C-alpha cells in the first residue's frame, strides 16, 4: 500500500537546494519531509540550515544531523514545508492539529515561500469540518472559553493525559467545532482582535503550492 504522506514528503524535498534556510514543519506528514532532508544531508552532502516549528521537530531534525538555527538567528527562511489539516480552493487552511500552530505560523510568515503537503482527504471546498485550534494564554482561558460558548463556537479545551494540554510556548489550546466557516477572513480578524488569544489555526495567504498525495502519485497544485 502506498504511503501518501511519505510520497509527498519526499516530493517536497526536491524543492530544497544547497544553501537554503529551510522551515521544517511539524506533524505526521512533515515527518517524512524532515526524514528525507536528513537522508540527503547524510548521503548527498546537502548543505542547508533548518528552522524548526516545534520542539518535537527540533529533536527529530537534530537526530538526523540536520544543522539547525533558531528563527531569531536568521533574517528569513527560503522555503517552509509543512502539513495542513484542511486546505480550501483559495489556498487558505487550518493547521494546529499537532498543537504547534504558533511556532508554525511564526516560521511561515518569515518565509519567502511555503509549500503544504497533504493527502487528498485534506482538500476541501469550505474550511471548518476540522476543529479550529486557538492558542490562548493560561490566564483568563476559562473566560475565553465562555466567550466562545456564547458565540456558538462549541469550544473544547485540548486535553492530554487528563489535563489541559500545554503547548511548547506554555499556552492552552481551545478547539472550536465550527463545522463550516462562512467567512475565513472575518473570523481570522475577530480572533486576532480577541484579548488573550495568542494565535489561531487559520493560515491565510501564506502558501504558493500544495503537494497532494494520490494513489497515482503526487499532484502539485500551484496558486494561480
From Swiss-Prot:
Pathway: Carbohydrate degradation; pentose phosphate pathway; D-ribose 5-phosphate from D-ribulose 5-phosphate (non-oxidative stage): step 1/1. The active site is at residue 104. InterPro entries: NagB/RpiA_transferase-like (IPR037171), Ribose-5P_isomerase (IPR050262), Ribose5P_isomerase_typA_subgr (IPR020672), Ribose5P_isomerase_type_A (IPR004788). One of its GO terms (biological process) is pentose-phosphate shunt, non-oxidative branch. Keywords: Isomerase. Signal peptide: none annotated. Pfam families: Rib_5-P_isom_A (PF06026). GO terms for molecular function: ribose-5-phosphate isomerase activity. Homodimer. Belongs to the ribose 5-phosphate isomerase family. This is Ribose-5-phosphate isomerase A. The lineage of its organism: Bacteria, Bacillati, Bacillota, Bacilli, Lactobacillales.
